[in-house]
Amino acid sequence: MAAANAYPGYQPVRSRWVSRVPEHWSLLRAKNFLREIDDRTKTGEETLLSMRQHRGLVPHNDVSVKRIPPENLIGYKKARPDELVLNRMQAGNAMFFRNRLSGLVSPDYAVFRLLRDDCPEYLGYLFRSWSIRGLFRSESKGLGTGTSGFLRLYSDRFAALEIPLPTRPEQDQIVAYLRAQDAHIARLI
């Protein structure tokens, strides 16, 4: 049995990962709604953040006993709340998160600031979805396959990706739904 359309009209998308989206959604290249930021620490005194698959960005000292002195962090990238952080070597493995804390991340990570009033949490969910992970993997360059290897999603390739974006109220509604589903699943575990 075919599923009913949730929206009155759809537009086709030139993409390998989705064939159509609601006609009122925007189709924007990533560079048109995100700007890559390269702001580096001069002191290394800020909190070092570590990226974890199931927790996102967390203080390094909360997940590791290895302490890193500030002088070793000079040149690391600054990340602020509501910016998005991408581990370029692990984009295809869903290592792309909304940042909730001020701190430092690896100089090899990409830090993005929103150019529009999009929901950063929605974008975090979107960029970790299975479809987008496949797209990121196909756009990455390097050696290896699957979850192993050295595949890097370069900034120019990410910037050129066409991403369908719902309106901000729809983004907020999707995030509320996903939070509720996450809470429901957590209760069952």
How does the language model describe each region?
Residues 12-13, 104-106, 155-157:
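Short glycine-enriched loop/turn motifs at secondary-structure junctions
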Residues 11-14, 28-42, 46-81:
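Sequence-specific dsDNA recognition surfaces
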Residues 29-41, 101, 111-168:
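Basic, amphipathic alpha-helical recognition segments used for DNA target recognition
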Residues 6-41, 164-173, 177-187:
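Non-catalytic DNA-recognition/assembly elements of restriction-modification systems
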Residues 122-126, 177, 188:
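Short amphipathic alpha-helical coupling segments at ligand-binding clamshell hinges
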Residues 2-4:
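N-terminal acidic, proline/glycine-rich, low-complexity intrinsically disordered segments
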Residues 45-65, 84-110, 125, 134-140:
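Short, ligand-facing micro-motifs at secondary-structure edges
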